[in-house]
């Protein structure tokens, strides 16, 4: 997947009510800053000018969020009623989301549930970060749970890494990034949660791979192509398969 440009938006699903895009890494969904001209919103407006809704600030209704650094499936509602039906699915926890990631080190357990509560870091210089309960300066930690399933052990630029499937069972800011870091396996390229050490990869290796939203009118079920394959990035070399991606996704349904 190449870096985002104004005219290379990738569409995974489209109906009269919804569009699901494959968001590029290092791309904001929207921005009020005049100098940030390339956003997902501007890509959508360029590709679908006739679908922009003048009654909304950004022109499009984003059903959920993805971090600036995270790529993958993101759902956009094309009208108010569709947005409401998607919002209800998220509120009622009917949505299934699964992410692919490369994490540092070889994860020894084939599966794990990570249940650290996560709060906002109020320490000076770290106020843009989240943290697990018990960290100095951790404010208002809330219960969080993530499932981690090991897919492959391998290496990235010669260093040991593990390819994992991550399923957030709650929806806290930076949850997957914080949880991976908290168990000693930060996401490859995550500068923020690697004590500002991991700066050499070209991107953070976190990708929203699978999204299922069972709205009353239609079932949205998409996969955003896996970017963590050797044909896409020769720095990643898988050595040993632990779980099949296809079988693991089938278990989520």
What is each stretch, according to the model?
Residues 54-92:
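Glycine/acidic-rich beta-strand-loop module
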Residues 8-11, 62, 147-150:
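A structural signal for short, hydrophobic beta-strand segments that form beta-sheets
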Residues 1-17, 27-28, 136-139, 156-159, ...:
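Pseudouridine synthases involved in rRNA/tRNA modification
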Residues 82, 110, 172:
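Short phosphate-engaging motifs
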Residues 97-100:
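A short, Trp-centered hydrophobic/proline-enriched beta-strand micro-motif
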Residues 27-46, 103-162, 178, 221-223, ...:
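Glycine- and acidic-residue-rich catalytic/RNA-contacting loop of pseudouridine synthases
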Residues 76-78, 102-104, 167:
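Short hydrophobic/aromatic beta-strand micro-patches
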